[in-house]
């Protein structure tokens, strides 16, 4: 649909969309007068996941389910998304700020020959143009930007936009497009599964406990993790702690890493 706002689904790799998608779909529906559509690249979609996207406000789910989409490789996602966008001609393509969406959406915008507004914190329609507000200069200023042509491509900072209210029983059309799955030019030499801490992710947490050099070593982060489990917080780390190898890069909360909008 030419006026549709696409929402690129970020999931937990187990067939469940992350809760940040309620924000993305809710904002897309608001801006497009209810013409929000979800685009899901996955190797294992679930009926519960499709139901959740519909209840958050997606009118249609473009489902590309193929083993080639996991583990994530940007070249495969980009090729499939670009071909689908050329056929369906969406007005806008929105995605949450996550590690893989940062890379994928940037490559997709370049492939489509359009601009990208990253880390957006607000949107408004100005006639038939979309205006995005995004931080610049390490968050010291806010800039309003727009696009020379559609599709308008943007990433949304999590925990900023109002999540869509779930509408139990709402249904969406599920479209399984027949687009080619690109052949990967890269191969995995080794794959290591991350061990779950059982704590909220930085991008979705309302409370973050962060430790830096003062932790004196990686073994002391268990103190923060124990406290985080009690209060329902996520655990982050400073750049110095990450550079020292005390915590993985996904825990870094300073410029260039995880984008979080915690309350505490």
Where are these regions (language model features)?
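N-terminal glycine-rich FAD/FM-binding segment characteristic of electron-transfer flavoproteins
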Residues: 1-263
